[in-house]
Amino acid sequence: MKVRASVRKICEDCRLIRRRGRLMVICSNPKHKQRQG
């Protein structure tokens, strides 16, 4: 899980979702998991 100020899609499988008021990226590739900090 990468914590970043700006999250963006890295590949086609990446999905932007909002969880508990935070923007997150979920993907089939675990390296692409991100959360806005």
Swiss-Prot record:
GO BP term, pick one: translation
Cellular location(s): Plastid, Chloroplast
Recorded GO MF terms: structural constituent of ribosome
Superkingdom as given in the UniProt entry: Eukaryota
Transmembrane spans: none
Pfam family, one: Ribosomal_L36
UniProt keyword list: Chloroplast, Plastid, Ribonucleoprotein, Ribosomal protein
Main location as per UniProt: plastid
Family: Belongs to the bacterial ribosomal protein bL36 family.
Name recorded for this polypeptide: Large ribosomal subunit protein bL36c
Organism, as annotated: Chlorokybus atmophyticus (Soil alga)
